[in-house]
Amino acid sequence: ESNTAIAHFATGKSDASGISAEDFEWVKRAQGTYDFTIYNRGPSASVNFFWFNQNAGISEEGRPYLPKHKLEWFTDKRFRQAILHGFNREGLIDAILFGKGEVLHSIIPPAKGEWHNPNVRKYDYSIAKAKALLQSAGFYWDSDRTLKDRNGEPVRFNLLLVESDRYDQIGVTFV
């Protein structure tokens, strides 16, 4: 648990500790009270990312892993690009990481050195680009502003979040 690790570090029970973004300000203030020094070791090698299930297979129970319409969405490059353009990474970094992060455009961060490719395609936050890509893929908005695919299926999908309790702390609920 993060709180225990930080407490052990601050009181000298451990010699080193990683600091999460949410603990950074407390640790920075505690530096004057406890006998330790914070060293900036540079960018983290960890990343947070999501991907879409594109498994067209059938489960052992004989059911498809995905409904056909969702498989069509997730395998359409324009749909995925639209999601990337509609994703406010800076806003997420500010809200979840308290500004202690950087926007990445690959699952390989700069801290990984020679394996990082800074020349990958970048998808800036642009609602206009996202909407244009969705429309080019046959999606549309009905009179209630619900996004639907070309067959009239509302666009809804689940996100599985490993650290969903962190989002709960700020009042964000994913279903």
Residue map of PLM features:
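Extracytoplasmic/periplasmic ligand-capture domains
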Residues: 1-98, 102, 111-175
